[in-house]
Amino acid sequence: MSLLPVMVIFGLSFPPVLFEMILSLALFFALRRFLLPSGIYDFVWHPALFNTALYCCVFYLISCHSGADCRYRYFPCLVLLYRIALDAGRQIHRRCGGHCAGRQRPAQRRAYS
């Protein structure tokens, strides 16, 4: 249950989660603008997955602080960022044999008989 009331604008009712999503989107863009020049994206294998995890974490923290019952506030965010941005990238990198991070795969010639 959120502390924010249901907003009614011109006869349309908007749930509190909509405003939490808009606020978390604004904070996500500000945080992303700060992180881009810092060089943290050089350590991230897949920036789109990292951005998704970052937005989910910001939304989770906003919704926890707006009145939702969250016992372990920061732990799920850290786990989500680690698993999606780093661990999944390493597993995919291992599957492709180390050639998928922007490097060219050496040409493989097959002898057809």
From Swiss-Prot:
Its membrane topology: Multi-pass membrane protein
Keywords, sorted A to Z: Cell membrane, Membrane, Transmembrane, Transmembrane helix
Pfam families recorded: DUF1656
Subcellular compartments: Cell membrane
Membrane-crossing residue ranges in chain numbering: 3-23, 43-63
Disulfide bond sites: none
Signal peptide: none
Gene Ontology cellular-component annotations: plasma membrane
Domain of life: Bacteria
NCBIfam families in alphabetical order: PRK11594.1 (NF008615)
Family classification: Belongs to the AaeX family.
This protein's name: Protein AaeX
Provenance organism: Sodalis glossinidius (strain morsitans)
